[in-house]
Amino acid sequence: MSQFSNNWDNKKGPGLGDKLMGRFNNPGPLKPRLDQATRQIQTVMAKLDTAVLKLRDRDTYLFNKIVASVQKRDNQRASMFANELAELRKMSKMVTQSKLALEQIVLRLNTVTELGEVVLTLAPATSVVRNLREGLAGVMPEAEGEMSEISGLLSGILVDAGSVTGTSLNFETANEEAERALAEAAAVAESRMKDKFPDIPQSIPDSNEMEMA
């Protein structure tokens, strides 16, 4: 029976993996801890969904204000609302990117079947969570604490899994994978933003231009 089986659900007697884990004051078998991490990530994802909806409502409000100001030739107010909307959309992109990146982490955690895969999966995942925590701090301060807990939980599992397998962590490779994952999430978020949100109006055609059209 593999070490992974012994350390996965802790239903069998202690094996080599269990003994090794004991040396490092193992706080519990891996599977329940991975499940806990998954649940915590999903909780944050639900909050991100709620944040996206609120940001979308605010986006619609500001966009309509810009249109009304442009129609009234009130460029000063139009510019004020446009600047606020631009900042709001940066926040929306960050929140959407975070949600997408966390979705990928959950998918990978749910497909882990071997102990060695835990290390390969969690190394970049932990780096992604750290980056997202920093990015969300200025957008959703209330999520920072939860992201810190998730980061700590994943780091603990990563260390314990690495101890059992004797796998040395390649932080450079993990960081590169994390950067790729974040870049992919950012690209998808940008695409979704373009699909869902109209361009910010700068001006409207005058009556002569409309008649010629």
Predicted segment positions?
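A cross-kingdom feature marking charged/low-complexity
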Residues: L109-T121
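Amphipathic alpha-helical coiled-coil segments
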Residues: L88-R108
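Long C-terminal interaction segments enriched in charged/acidic composition
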Residues: M1-T50, V119-A213
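Solenoid-repeat scaffolds in large eukaryotic assemblies
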Residues: R77-A78
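Hydrophobic side-chain positions on well-ordered alpha-helices
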Residues: L62-S69
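Residue-level signature of catalytic and energy-coupling elements of molecular machines
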Residues: R73
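Extended, amphipathic, non-transmembrane alpha-helical segments
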Residues: K54-L62
